Regions:
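Acidic, Ser/Thr- and Pro/Gly-rich low-complexity regulatory segments
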Residues: 1-4
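Sigma70-family region 2
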Residues: 11-12, 38, 48-66, 85-86
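Short, charged helix-capping/linker segments at alpha-helix termini
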Residues: 11-20, 30-49
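Alpha-helix N-cap and coil->helix boundary residues
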Residues: 20, 41-46, 65, 69, ...
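Residue-level preference for hydrophobic side chains embedded in well-ordered alpha helices
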Residues: 21, 25, 29, 50, ...
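Arg/Lys-rich amphipathic alpha helix in sigma70-family domain 2
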Residues: 75-93
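Internal acidic/polar
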Residues: 88-109
């Protein structure tokens, strides 16, 4: 199916839009996600989240280049997921520890 036909299905709110998108661009989106995440499960979740985001975004928005639109969504979702996982590996505390020390410093002055 052509991209315009898939986009029309999104505008009609037909679930067939997701099926056709997966047939045509599932491998493309998965490759983007896997190159970032290096995990089959996380990549599959990112692709599913991509379809959900496309479903919620396309009507009223109409992408000019559907593959680029999906690729950008997949990339952003995958990077966000990677950042969350990286933060958890570091303990997930991040700036919180610094804020506590800063508060101690301000109280001492």
């Amino acid at each position: 199916m052509e991209d315009q036909g898939i986009i029309d299905l999104f505008f009609e709110r037909s679930e067939q839009a997701i099926t056709e998108t997966d047939k045509k661009y599932g491998g493309y989106c998965y490759a983007i996600a896997y190159n970032i995440l290096s995990s089959r499960e996380d990549s599959e979740e990112s692709v599913s989240d991509t379809y959900l985001t496309a479903w919620n975004t396309i009507p009223p928005r109409k992408p000019n280049i559907f593959s680029a639109f999906l690729g950008k969504i997949t990339r952003h979702i995958s990077i966000d997921r990677w950042r969350k996982q990286s933060a958890q590996k570091r303990g997930g505390k991040g700036v919180t520890g610094l804020a506590t020390k800063e508060e101690d410093f301000v109280q001492d002055v």
